[in-house]
Amino acid sequence: MNKIKNGWLSQIRKVISPHFDERPDVEDISLLVIHYISLPPEQFGGGYVDDFFQGKLDPTIHPYFEEIYQFRVSAHCLIERDGKVTQYVSFNDRAWHAGLSCFEGRDKCNDFAIGIELEGSNEQPFTAEQYQVLAALTRDIMQAYPKITLDRIVGHCDISPGRKIDPGQYFEWERYLALVKKGLDKK
């Protein structure tokens, strides 16, 4: 179990993103949004997600980077293919991950959501390590933010339909939720 103190996970890598601001109400954190990211598309590793979330992406490295390097986005955490977690923004702050979004009639999901990126794509399955780590991280988040319940865990596609497709066709919701529940039963 990873302790969360003042919105930060203990014992994991931190790379601070400047792309965040204060939440309107920390007590309102009540949604977990699952995303995927790969930079360049369909490629893993390389540290480009760190650069992107810090506003330091070099547009000369890859043609796709020319399109996105000026975007100001972040997520709270990234889970890499090997299960390594990096935190970019305190859970108590508003990361800029959801964009135009709506959940149960409420707009601006960044105001009340935590965003977790999985290193991945819509073209291949996620790893066993990612499912294990995501489930454990989810349980830690649920313990620290009890308004996040199993029915308030969604994909980016669910809050931005027609605009986003992540976590994509290969994300195994049943597998992930079973792992989350299995760990909750032990507590």
Model features per residue range: what roles?
Residues 1-107:
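N-terminal catalytic cores of peptidoglycan-degrading enzymes
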Residues 34, 116, 134:
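Conserved, mostly hydrophobic/aromatic
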